[in-house]
Amino acid sequence: MHISEKSCTFAAVFENNMSEDQKTHIIKTAGEMFFRLGIRSVSIDDICHELGMSKKTFYVYFESKDALIEQMLQANIDYIGGKMKSLSEQGDFRQLVKKFLKHQEAEKNDVRRVPQLVYDLKKYYPRQFADFQVKCFEMQKGYIKQYIELGVAQGLVRANLNVELAAVLFAKIHNDAIRDFEEIEMHNHNLHQLAHTAMDVFVRGILSEEGLKLYNEK
């Protein structure tokens, strides 16, 4: 029986897609467990039990727990990047800010679970955490710069603003807040409260008179 090259290619693509789906499922399940229980307290055995999967199958996709954590963090960056890219395609600065604030509010429950995850990453996986922070910083800086440039073009952000520096400032505030969450909690505040306040102060600081007038009507 002759099997065409096209059929073989389709089979290979299908098999690869199935493999990626399984890998994504493992990352998603493990990520949820890490957020809920902390990274240190969740073993590969726990993840496999939750998935109904053998350790042999797990190791087909990840050579170690460290490798899983690295890919989970990359998946998180991709998720945040997707959200920010979607906002950058709005074409309307006022709507962009509204949606940014809406996303922030919708994800407040997830933000409250971040401290345990960050604590474990800082203590037990410092290299992966440092790499994650660098990637997050660069990604956020790039998109925030796009947002601000859109606002300037539409007359809603101050034309004399140092756009590059403002984008760096926003990304640094966000990343430092996640890294130093213990200091925030010492003052009886949480990450969501800080993120909301920082966003409000930042936006008010960069807006033109017209932009501020519209922002106050939100």
Task: Annotate each language-model stretch with its function.
Residues 1-16, 146-150, 154, 183, ...:
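C-terminal peripheral helix-coil segments that are non-catalytic and often amphipathic
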Residues 25, 33-71:
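Helix-turn-helix
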Residues 159-181, 191-205:
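Hydrophobic alpha-helical segments that form the core
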